[in-house]
Each structure stands twice: as C-alpha cells, then as structure tokens.
C-alpha cells in the first residue's frame, strides 16, 4: 500500500485526538474500516436549473461504486451551475463566467476543508468542466474528470435540430420568415432530454478538452447523457481515481505545456468553441504553465480543420460519438505527428498508448471526420487577431464563416441589449460592423455571450453580410463574422472604447488583423478625452469579480 494514500485525510481523521472528527462520519453510517481507507470527494455540478447536469447526481452513485471497488470511501458534494442557455440575453448571463471561478473555489473549499485524498469531477454544461479542471490543476492531488454528455438531437418536421436552430429562429420570426407555430414547434422539440446542447458548442468542446488534456478516460467525452456507456465510464472513472492515488499521479504531472499543445491542436482540428481559448488559458494559469494567445495562433496555422460539426458544419456530438468520438480525431492527428504522443494521462499511460489500445467502431466516418490529407479547411477553426483595435488580441471562429475579410462602418452600442433591440428593429444594414462594448470581464462585468444578437443577425439572413466585434464572448453556437474577446476591453480604456459610429473597421482573418482605419493621432486624441464609466455594481459578487478579474487575453482569471 502506498503510504501517502491517506496522507491528507489522516491529518483530519487519524489519531485519538481526532475522535470527534470521526464521530461526524460515523453519524452517517461510516465504519472504522471506511475511515481507514482513502477518503475521496465526488464533486458533482448539479442543480435543477436546466437539463445539462440533471442526470449527474444519479451517475455520482455509479462513480461511488467504482471508488469503493478500488478501495476508497467516496463522499459526494455539489458545485453550483449556471445554465447559459437560460441566462442568455439577460443580466443573469453576467454570472456565467463568474461561475467558472465559483466552481473551482467550491471544489477547493470542500476538498481542502475535509482533507480528501483525491476527487472525481462530474460536470456538464459550459463553465463547470473548466472550473473543475482549474480546481484539479490548483489543488494538484489525484483527480480525474468525467464529462456528463450531450443531449440527443431534437426533431423539427423530420429534420434533426439543436438549440442553435431555436436561437436563429427568433431572428427569422422577427423578419417574418417563419410562423409562430414553427417557432413553438422548435421550442418544444429542440432538447429531447438530459445532457448538454447538441452541437460542438462550448460544453461539448470542453468535453473534448477533458480527453485531449489527458484528464479523462479515453472515449468518455462523446457518449450522450442517456447512453448506457455513461454508466460504464462513471464506474471506471471512480475506479481510475483509486489507481491515481495508488501510483501518486497528479494533475500537474499530466498538465505539461505539451498537453496544452495537444488540447489546442484538437480544438483547432475540430472547429470548437472560442470559449475554449479562455478556459485553456485559465487551466494553464492554475497549473503554472505559461500559455499565451500566440500559442493558439501558432498551432492553428499548422493544424487542418478536419471535423464537420455544428455550428459551422452539419453534425452533432451524437454523430461524432457514433464514429469514434475524441479518439478518432486524436488518432488522425497523432498519425500526422500533430500530437505529442508521449504525454502521460490519467490512465497512467501515454496518449499514444491509449490510442493504440482504444478500439474505434468500424463504420464510415469521413463525412464527419476527414483525413488530414483532405481537410475541410487547411488551417484551424479559430484565428487570433491583433491590431490597432486589439493590441492584446481577439478571437474569430473562422470555421463558422466563409468570410475571411470584412470592411465596413461601425455601429456602436454600449450594451448587448441596445444592439439586440437595433437588430430586431431591422436597423442594421448589410456591410455594417456591429460593435458591442463594455461587456468585457470588468466592464460587463462577467463577459456575457452575445448569442441573442448573433443568432438574430443570422436568422435575418445577414450572417455573412454583417460583422460583429465585442469585448464580450460568444456562445459556442455562434456562427457568422463574429470577433470576440477584444482586449484590452472598453472598461479599461482599450481602443474599442474609442470607436464612434461610422468609423471604418477592417477584419482580416487571413492575416490575423483587427484594425480601425484611423490615424494614431486621432486615437490618441480620443483616448485623452475618454473617461472610465462608473462601476455598474458597487457591492455583491459582480462587484468583487470586476475588481479582481484579469484581461480576456489572460483567460479572465482572478488575480490574487
């Protein structure tokens, strides 16, 4: 037996002087034998706010069985969840990115307060997987994550749909393109049950990242929430934690710079969500790994996009699962020498060993995942932009638009609500560049996602004719000429704060540029005249967050 297996919990529960501590455990039915084993947490992101995590409390019981089979004593605790799809387009969305930090802090609080020897993380939706992985990196004790899985595709008049279709239908209805009955039918049928939004949006992207980083069991990201494979993976994940404790393998042994390069490569090859840029930066920060936006752009330029999934493509996560999930993508990348195969993972084996042992289904797959030699695009799905409007950087999801260059007049709005109203009132014209500012990490605060606005633009048929730039974020379901994470943000006096209606903005994804066609003298003059707006919140969580949060170019982490 590894003598360090109970190193942490012995400090809380070992020795005669800890008799009162043990009494609390015995009040819940634990025995001396239970307490003598490694005591581990099962961190479950769960509430009844939405379907993304609703099934995870049940799966936690299966994880506990796996832990017990490996010789551990499991203790379940929950972490809070914000359902982005419900908070979207409201003040509630300001709490979404904040919840990532709250999840990480919650795990730290419970695990450290009770001296757990390790933990399993169960998480679905957008911010809980990155929050859990941040906690894993921060605490650096044996731990493993299992993503909760996607919902199944919905159905509208015989066609598969996802929540993306409902958002875009709002814009189509406002334009008179569809009937109220069609909108209602989509609303009623887009999400048929438990699990996360069906396309390669933020949640499913972060599910892929759990595997690509080496923090989850191979193949565990793609099974739908209702698939029986979820039960198998839940059990095996609990059992795998006990092996990690036995061999002393910790997250920072896994989360090397090369592991992050692997994750970024999978992100770029799959055309995943721009939110993954923020989250990978934040996980790297917690792991003590120096990762920058330049690393993302460098890897994007060498990585072909080989996956055909919504929002830019045709297929949902359910379809990817049927052809092999993350291991299929990673095998193709490894064979092309685009992944580091020698990186260690939570199995105790390397990426290469895992992929050699993983059995892919023998089914046609090139309609969803192409060979490296015949990609959908020659470079990655996300491009980092810099220039006079974004000295620190900005992101564009090139996999979700055919337009790589756009030049047009600015239509400036100081909030998402102002912009959304203008779009619904059809005040946005072809070639315009909608600017939504003061929605950054500090300015929002909380860096809201602009899905209501972007979907309305697309729904009105302007997705490839109107551009949008913001210091806020985008949902993974966003498509069109959409540039986000513009840094520095408006609230700290970034160049986006200096824009005026009619200024000519140039988006050049081919060359990685985001500029305003103004002389430096004019920008300096406007900067001298600019005054910071007063804080939107003077007390409470959002006020605290605004004071501590860093730039989106650093992952919007809290600086301490």
Swiss-Prot record:
InterPro entries: DHAD_IlvD/Edd (IPR050165), Dihydro-acid_dehy_C (IPR042096), DihydroxyA_deHydtase (IPR004404), DiOHA_6PGluconate_deHydtase_CS (IPR020558), ILV_EDD_C (IPR056740), ILV_EDD_N (IPR000581), IlvD/EDD_N (IPR037237). Pathway: Amino-acid biosynthesis; L-isoleucine biosynthesis; L-isoleucine from 2-oxobutanoate: step 3/4; Amino-acid biosynthesis; L-valine biosynthesis; L-valine from pyruvate: step 3/4. It comes from Sulfurisphaera tokodaii (strain DSM 16993 / JCM 10545 / NBRC 100140 / 7). Keywords: 2Fe-2S, Amino-acid biosynthesis, Branched-chain amino acid biosynthesis, Iron, Iron-sulfur, Lyase, Magnesium, Metal-binding. The active site is at 475 (proton acceptor). Belongs to the IlvD/Edd family. Its cofactor is [2Fe-2S] cluster; Mg(2+). The lineage of its organism: Archaea, Thermoproteota, Thermoprotei, Sulfolobales, Sulfolobaceae. The keyword Nucleus does not apply. The keyword Transferase does not apply. It is an enzyme of class 4 (lyase). It comes from the Archaea. Mg(2+) binds at residues 84, 126-127, 449. This is Dihydroxy-acid dehydratase. Its EC number is 4.2.1.9.
């Amino acid at each position: 037996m590894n003598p360090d297996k109970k190193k942490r919990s012995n400090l809380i529960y070992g020795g005669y002087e800890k008799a009162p501590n043990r009494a609390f455990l015995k009040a819940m039915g634990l025995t001396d034998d239970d307490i003598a084993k490694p005591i581990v947490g099962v961190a479950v992101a769960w509430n009844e706010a939405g379907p993304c995590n609703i099934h995870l409390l049940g799966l936690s019981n299966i994880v506990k069985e796996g832990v017990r089979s490996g010789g551990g004593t499991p203790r379940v605790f929950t972490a809070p969840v914000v359902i982005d799809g419900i908070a979207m387009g409201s003040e509630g969305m300001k709490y979404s990115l904040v919840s990532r930090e709250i999840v990480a802090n919650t795990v730290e609080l419970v695990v450290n307060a009770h001296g757990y020897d390790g933990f399993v993380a169960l998480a679905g939706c957008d911010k809980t997987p990155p929050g859990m992985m941040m906690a894993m990196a921060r605490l650096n004790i044996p731990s493993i994550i299992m993503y909760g899985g996607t919902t199944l595709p919905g159905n509208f008049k015989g066609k598969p749909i996802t929540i993306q279709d409902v958002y875009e239908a709002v814009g189509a209805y406002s334009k008179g393109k569809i009937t109220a009955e069609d909108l209602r039918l989509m609303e009623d049928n887009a999400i048929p049950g438990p699990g996360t939004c069906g396309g390669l949006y933020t949640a499913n992207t972060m599910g892929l990242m759990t595997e690509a980083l080496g923090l989850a069991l191979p193949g565990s990201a793609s099974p739908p929430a209702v698939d029986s494979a979820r039960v198998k993976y839940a059990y095996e994940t609990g059992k795998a934690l006990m092996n990690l404790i036995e061999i002393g393998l910790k997250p920072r042994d896994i989360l090397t710079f090369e592991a992050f390069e692997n994750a970024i490569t999978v992100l770029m090859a799959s055309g995943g969500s721009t939110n993954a840029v923020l989250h990978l930066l934040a996980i790297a920060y917690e792991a003590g790994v120096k990762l920058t936006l330049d690393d993302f752009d460098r890897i994007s330029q060498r990585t072909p996009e080989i996956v055909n999934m919504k929002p830019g493509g045709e297929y949902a996560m359910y379809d990817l699962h049927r052809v092999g999930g993350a291991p299929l993508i990673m095998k193709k990348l490894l064979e092309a020498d685009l992944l580091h195969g020698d990186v260690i993972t939570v199995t105790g084996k390397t990426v290469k060993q895992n992929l050699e042992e993983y059995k892919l289904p023998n089914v046609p797959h090139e309609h969803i995942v192409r060979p490296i030699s015949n990609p959908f695009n020659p470079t990655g799905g996300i491009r980092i932009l810099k220039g006079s409007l974004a000295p620190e950087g900005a992101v564009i999801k090139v996999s979700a638009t055919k337009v790589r260059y756009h030049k047009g007049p600015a239509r400036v709005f100081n909030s998402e609500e102002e912009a959304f109203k203008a779009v619904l009132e059809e005040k946005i014209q072809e070639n315009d560049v909608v600017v939504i500012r003061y929605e950054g990490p500090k300015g929002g605060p909380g860096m809201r996602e602009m899905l209501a606005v972007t979907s309305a633009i697309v729904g009105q048929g302007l997705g490839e004719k109107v551009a949008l730039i913001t210091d806020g974020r985008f949902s993974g379901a966003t498509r069109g000429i959409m540039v986000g994470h513009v840094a520095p943000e408006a609230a700290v006096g970034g160049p986006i704060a200096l824009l005026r209606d009619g200024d000519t903005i140039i988006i050049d994804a081919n060359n990685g540029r985001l500029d305003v066609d103004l002389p430096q003298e004019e920008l300096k003059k406007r900067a001298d005249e600019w005054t910071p707006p007063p804080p939107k919140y003077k007390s409470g969580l959002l006020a605290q967050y605004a004071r501590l949060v860093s730039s989106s170019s650093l992952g919007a982490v809290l600086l301490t």
